[in-house]
Amino acid sequence: MTLKQLVTGCYTILRSIWMIGMQAFNKRETQMYPDIPIYQTSRFRGRIVLTCDPDGYERCVACNLCAVACPVDCISLQKTESKEGRWYPEFFRINFSRCIFCGLCEEACPTTAIQLTPDFEMAEFKRQDLVYEKEDLLIRGPGKYPEYNFYRMAGIACNDKLKGHAENETRPINVKDLLP
């Protein structure tokens, strides 16, 4: 080993120690995430939830628009009807391992049942645990739109009257009778 190599080696070691020492007193760039919560904007799109209307019923009418709008096909549901004639999903399933949190399902929902929340901590050890059922997604509250009730805005079906028998309503036309 020559004297030049010895001096160069000592210089590089001292330079490294000096750089580490100078960085020790600088402001930290790393955010201490679990201790200090991360700031999120008001438009942040996180975990998907299903909300209820002000009367306490679930808002989802199983129209399937959210599943059609989803670009990665992570939403699946099946429609059923209650005794009162109200539609609701028999099952509602979201596979969060495929979801890209784009928000298209929230925009497509006519009843504001699907809403994206600021929650983003959904880490799991098994991929099967990222498939959420309706019971996991349903929250007891109206979410972002507390006063909106789809059935009050769209109207309620009358069970005792047929189509066209209510006031100011014309009877439906059978289009097959119009054909030659």
UniProtKB/Swiss-Prot annotation:
Cofactor: [4Fe-4S] cluster
4Fe-4S ferredoxin-type domain boundaries: 46-80, 90-119
Catalysed reaction, written as an equation: a quinone + NADH + 5 H(+)(in) = a quinol + NAD(+) + 4 H(+)(out)
Primary site of residence: membrane
Keyword Translocase: yes
Annotated positions binding [4Fe-4S] cluster 1: 60, 63, 66, 109
Group of enzyme by EC: translocase
Localization of this protein: Cell membrane
Entry's Gene Ontology BP terms: aerobic respiration
Domain of life: Bacteria
InterPro entries, A to Z: 4Fe4S_Fe-S-bd, 4Fe4S_Fe_S_CS, NADH_quinone_OxRdtase_chainI
Membrane topology field: Peripheral membrane protein
Summary of subunit composition and partner proteins: NDH-1 is composed of 14 different subunits. Subunits NuoA, H, J, K, L, M, N constitute the membrane sector of the complex.
Role: NDH-1 shuttles electrons from NADH, via FMN and iron-sulfur (Fe-S) centers, to quinones in the respiratory chain. The immediate electron acceptor for the enzyme in this species is believed to be ubiquinone. Couples the redox reaction to proton translocation (for every two electrons transferred, four hydrogen ions are translocated across the cytoplasmic membrane), and thus conserves the redox energy in a proton gradient.
Record-given protein name: NADH-quinone oxidoreductase subunit I
UniProt organism field: Baumannia cicadellinicola subsp. Homalodisca coagulata
